[in-house]
From Swiss-Prot:
Pfam families: 2OG-FeII_Oxy_3 (PF13640), PKHD_C (PF18331)
HAMAP family cross-referenced by the UniProt entry: Hydroxyl_YbiX
Cofactor note: Binds 1 Fe(2+) ion per subunit.
Name of the featured protein: PKHD-type hydroxylase cce_3668
SMART domains: P4Hc
InterPro entries: Oxoglu/Fe-dep_dioxygenase_dom (IPR005123), PKHD_C (IPR041097), PKHD_hydroxylase (IPR023550), Pro_4_hyd_alph (IPR006620), Pro_4_hyd_alph_FE2OG_OXY (IPR044862)
Source organism (scientific name): Crocosphaera subtropica (strain ATCC 51142 / BH68)
Catalytic class of the enzyme: oxidoreductase
Molecular function per GO: 2-oxoglutarate-dependent dioxygenase activity; iron ion binding; L-ascorbic acid binding
Keywords of the record: Dioxygenase, Iron, Metal-binding, Oxidoreductase, Vitamin C
Cofactors named for this entry: Fe(2+); L-ascorbate
Keyword Iron attributed: yes
């Protein structure tokens, strides 16, 4: 399941984030790429040792954790390995798949990948996120403060930036539900049960769906 959420950041959070990043020290993005992804990665990233990194990570993680749609669809256990990435003219990230395990001393799975857009789409040419699916490529270039989340199993790439600057936050989620099909089933059931509750209250139909949702979550969560 691929999901987009608009305005995951407030306007104040977006301004704070972009203002701090405009003064940040960016380094070669290849330092955080896997051995094969290094061959196709050309961007820069905020130095992970910079003093502002912790507060910026907390800002983004808090924004995600307070969003109900994110929680219902993703079932996050750990949000991790955030990167504050910048693409300038001629920079790109070729087709690649994300590492299955990420982290420093403690490893987390990459079940769900996300890109949080910080730059206005009109401010740069190119730079689309392309998710490669068997039935065809999907292209994403969202408004600032909006996010796209997708299974980390997909090949994906970032097209070459021709003009302007593309600023994004990328990161990964270790989900309680590792299988994308199971996450989608739970999300669909949850959506229907909430709709029934809104119309009919705590009905017999709601109780049956609530029981099924809870039992599947109990069976699948790890």
């Amino acid at each position: 399941m691929i999901l987009t959420i608009d305005n995951i950041l407030t306007s104040e959070e977006l301004t704070e984030l972009t203002d701090i990043l405009s003064q940040g020290n960016f380094v070669d993005g290849q330092t955080t790429a896997g051995w094969h992804a290094k061959l196709v990665k050309q961007n820069s990233q905020l130095d992970k040792t910079a003093p502002e990194v912790k507060s910026l990570e907390a800002l983004v993680i808090n924004a995600l954790q307070r969003n109900l749609l994110f929680k219902l669809a993703i079932h996050p256990k750990h949000i991790h390995s955030l990167r504050f990435s910048r693409y300038e003219p001629k920079m790109h990230y070729g087709s690649h798949t994300d590492n299955a395990l990420m982290g420093g001393q403690q490893f987390f799975r990459s079940d769900v990948s996300f890109t949080l857009f910080l730059s206005s789409p009109e401010s740069y040419e190119g730079g689309e996120l392309i998710i490669e699916k068997p039935e065809g490529d999907l292209s994403y270039k969202l408004n600032p403060g909006s996010i796209v989340l997708y299974p980390s199993t997909f090949l994906h790439r970032v097209e070459t930036v021709k003009t302007g600057t593309r600023l994004v936050v990328v990161g990964w989620v270790h989900s309680l539900i590792r299988d994308t099909a199971q996450r989608e089933i739970l999300f669909d059931i949850d959506t229907v049960r909430r709709s029934i509750f809104a119309k009919d209250g705590k009905s017999v139909e709601f109780d049956l769906l609530a029981k099924t949702h809870a039992n599947l979550l109990r069976q699948w969560a790890d």
